[in-house]
């Protein structure tokens, strides 16, 4: 049975069958005094104890960085928890060989985003109290890791009016990204360098499946990461066009709609109250003036995409867009 000395005498803190015990309820620079006695299986004391006890001032040991790993956000540092301390102070080694403080935290991990591809980073750590004073030593050699950007992940592929929109995660320390699509022969073909984290591929065809991958590049256009060799795939299905403007003109109702990537043309429909949709015009343009609209009547239009054979290849807005013909 282990006891610690309090202002009111000895306080029991632990019964154990082992021959060692670690007291984690400690404070920095606190001196604690312990004693102990034997017990039987029923918890009865069966020995005396040292009434003076044994004392120890608690000084936090130096933390150990147990893991350094490359992530999409930078180098992630993980270290062991130290009992009784408020937090930790991280340092990195400068080019001149000194240590520079860069983060105070109460956690036991942190990701350094201030990294550069292929640059070696060296870190060390020490404990701090709630006032920011250091309360432990530190490993003067530190722990080192070369930052190698991880391959980006395409997180979303979606059909839009502009084509297939690709979105991917940001990778720390890189200049930009290089996009590739898979060719019919199975190889990868580069088609776009960008510093953004999304891009819309307009070079698509209806019902064709496109496969993409991506890697990081530096400012000179050199690749600095690997890539996902299987890629991410999406079948391009044209979205329904949207009529953006309806105007009365001397020749009829002028309808204008947005362009949809990869399609041959568009089919315009009209209907009147209580009626059904009637085809007005097939066109490769994104506007048309309907001279057949009845004057004084509320007329509603919608539009869908067609291929070169006149087959519809998109849905349409069933509510449509309306105007009263003057």
Model-derived features: where do they sit?
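Arginine-selective low-complexity/disordered segments
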Residues: 1, 10-12, 30, 37-38, ...
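Hydrophobic loop/turn residues within beta-sheet-rich immunoglobulin-like superfamily modules
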Residues: 26, 71, 82, 115, ...
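Extracellular fibronectin type III
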Residues: 41-60, 130-149, 219-238, 308-326
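Intrinsically disordered, low-complexity linker/propeptide segments enriched in Ser/Thr/Gly/Pro
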Residues: 1-6, 13-16, 22, 34-38, ...
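Beta-strand-rich modules
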Residues: 23-42, 112-132, 201-221, 290-311
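Conserved aromatic anchor
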Residues: 74-84, 162-173, 251-262
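Proline-enriched interdomain boundary motifs that mark the N-terminal boundary
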Residues: 59-68, 148-157, 237-246
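Recognizes extended acidic, P/S/T-rich segments that occur
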Residues: 2-28, 89-118, 178-207, 267-294
